[in-house]
Amino acid sequence: MTDNHAHLGWYSDGYHSPKEVWQAEQEAGIEEIVVSSTSTCAEKYKLVVREMRELIRLGGTRIHPILWLTPRMFHSNCRWAIPYMIHSKIRWQGVKMHWLAHKEWYHNRKLLHNALELAHWLDVPVLFHTGDFKECKANVFKEVCTKYDHLTFVLAHGRPLNETKDVLANCSNAYLDTAFMPVDHVKELAEAGFAQRILYGTDAPINQLFYEDMSTAEYIKNNISEMRNVLGNDLYHTIMSNQLYK
């Protein structure tokens, strides 16, 4: 079983080490994780590389690293960052952009193009955060998925639901992950014919910000149990076996 949306590093509730994250995922029964570092948002690129190296040391090929891109990485005063991370001997298996955290992606399409060209060069999927704000609603990415139809995109969180459904219906290169999604939304999308394009994800350990009295392992176990109960065996096993990052 793979958690297709996990994190490590600095976040508003403190620091989540590679060991903490990997142990929690394993305790919950997760075998592989697709993971990006929230330390990227503090532009701590060297720390990100150290974190990923340590996580890979712990988990080996069961770790699927995602390169979180920020606009600053493409600015002239910080252009060393991407080459540094690319040549870090980490085999990045996806790139991520968070348009709400970094609104410049929304306003600067040349910058976005450069980031997507990097994804094309790396030959990896692109993960977009989606949410209920104008910069990151799912339909914002419909044009991107259509224009860059040679790339594969993942809409993290699937928000808003109807817009996510519209993107999936019109863009065969679009997937979504279930991180922090209501399970009834997951079921609705699966029953609409998109089960093969739904990736299981948890957003762990960000859950600790919202569920302070529950461990990450317990949160994941509860989420998996709810998925199984609500989806039923067939849809549950289909979604849990989907794998995009390799």
PLM features per residue range, with description:
Residues 1-11, 127-131, 156:
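Histidine-centered catalytic micro-motifs
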Residues 104-199:
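Catalytic pocket-lining loop regions of alpha/beta-barrel enzymes
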Residues 4-7, 13, 19-43, 62-70, ...:
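Divalent metal-dependent hydrolysis catalytic cores, especially in the metallo-beta-lactamase
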Residues 12-15, 47, 136-142, 164-170, ...:
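Histidine/acidic-residue-rich catalytic or RNA/ligand-binding cores of hydrolases
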Residues 31-32, 46-125, 172-175, 189:
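Active-site gating/metal-coordination segments in enzymes
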Residues 10-16, 39-47, 70-78, 102-107, ...:
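Acidic-and-aromatic substrate-binding clefts and catalytic sites of carbohydrate-active enzymes
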Residues 1-4, 34-37, 66-68, 96, ...:
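Active-site neighborhood of phospho(di)ester-bond hydrolases with catalytic His/Asp-centered motifs
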Residues 2-4, 15-36, 120, 195-196, ...:
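Mid-to-C-terminal alpha-helical segments outside catalytic/metal-binding sites
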